[in-house]
Amino acid sequence: MSTIEERVKKIVVEQLGVKEEEVTNSASFVDDLGADSLDTVELVMALEEEFECEIPDEEAEKITSVQQAIDYVKVHVKS
């Protein structure tokens, strides 16, 4: 079983079409990885599907980096 961090990074690579080595914990989806608003919505939807959770819109807006996505999942998803 992959760790939450590995699973989040895999989703980011798949959704944004970036190289795995570009996906660092501090990487911003928009500034560093070139995501647009549609990409970020699709990214949140992929996270919801992977971790079988619902991320409210007001929370999704706060998830702007890889680390924030990892932290959100760790806090809100029962492993």
Swiss-Prot record:
Record flagged with keyword Lipid metabolism: yes
Transmembrane segments: none
GO cellular component: cytosol; membrane
Pfam families, per the entry: PP-binding
PROSITE patterns recorded: CARRIER, PHOSPHOPANTETHEINE
Pathway in which this enzyme or protein is active: Lipid metabolism; fatty acid biosynthesis
A GO biological-process term: lipid A biosynthetic process
SUPFAM superfamilies for the chain: ACP-like
Classification via InterPro entries: ACP (IPR003231), ACP-like_sf (IPR036736), PP-bd_ACP (IPR009081), Ppantetheine_attach_site (IPR006162)
Subcellular location: Cytoplasm
Gene Ontology molecular function, alphabetical: acyl binding; acyl carrier activity
Keywords attached to this entry: Cytoplasm, Fatty acid biosynthesis, Fatty acid metabolism, Lipid biosynthesis, Lipid metabolism, Phosphopantetheine, Phosphoprotein
Modified residues annotated as O-(pantetheine 4'-phosphoryl)serine in this record: S37
Post-translational modification: 4'-phosphopantetheine is transferred from CoA to a specific serine of apo-ACP by AcpS. This modification is essential for activity because fatty acids are bound in thioester linkage to the sulfhydryl of the prosthetic group.
Start and end residues of each Carrier domain: 2-77
Similarity annotation: Belongs to the acyl carrier protein (ACP) family.
Function description: Carrier of the growing fatty acid chain in fatty acid biosynthesis.
Designated name of the protein: Acyl carrier protein
